Amino acid sequence: MVIAGAGAGGGVAAYVLAAAGKRVLLLDRGRWLDFATTGRDHLRNHRLATYGHNTGPELVGNPRVFVDVHGTEHVVAPNSSDYHHNASAVGGGTVVYGGQAWRFHPLDFRMASTYGSPSGSSLEDWPISYDDLAPYYELAEWLVGVAGGPPSSQMPERRGYPMPAHVLHRKGRALRAAAEKMGWETQSVPLLMNSVPWDGRAACSNCQQCVGFACPVDAKNGTQNTAIRRAIETGNCRVWDQAVASSLSFEAGRVTGLRVFRCGSWHEIKADAVVLACGAIETARLLLH
């Protein structure tokens, strides 16, 4: 099997399939990134790219066409805010995200039934409920690693998190005390960051540089250091970084693989099944190409 995109979805898919005995080739256009390669320059990162960015793709050779509200097309580079990109890396955006791990509330699955559908709104009911998805939330929380508090009335998890909540600092303690005086229930933010040593990696060092950068002590949990690592450890998964999926291959009306450019050469990858996990823009591009 071949998976295009080694982010949150593709990384987990690689682990599930490899653990089930399937042979998996996991592709990503980006590289393996760590703190040494992403740095912590607040003028050069994926959110503020005034002087370039730190997550790829390269600024030259990776244009996108952005259409503004007037219908005018603009060719933009990866460091433009109109590029609408998170990160090109093994692990995708999970390398540089803030790591909040909220579940949707049960009402989020019934927005139209709860609030109606005003003209121009996008409120819809999901075809599934919170209870349908809850077991998969739990699997993901334990696979990737979430630190959080006990269940609350607003978010009744069926099982606790694998790690305790992070300790509140002074500002958090002040806010919690004020909320309690007002009779408001509070809960700790569930975070995909180690509050204690976990999975062979260190606990959070409280550097407060999570968003936009890799973790200096590898305490932030993304697919690159959890699901993908475990997929590789099964012996059934290979990872090709810096591999650009150009188009789908077809035979007799069926998808049979991907055409991929890597290390200066074109490769025709044949597979029994193809998983597209390239994000909203790149997945759509592949399907339309």
What label would you give each PLM region?
Residues 6-9, 167, 171, 219-223, ...:
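Short, glycine/acidic-rich beta->alpha junctions
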Residues 15, 19, 29, 131-142, ...:
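A broad, structural surface signal
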Residues 16-19, 23-46, 234, 243, ...:
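Glycine-rich loop(s) and the adjacent beta-strand/alpha-helix scaffold that form part
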Residues 88-201:
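Rossmann-like flavin
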Residues 123-126, 164-166, 214-221, 276-277:
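Hydrophobic alpha-helical scaffolding
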Residues 174-180, 201-272:
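Helical element adjacent to the flavin cofactor pocket in flavoenzyme catalytic cores
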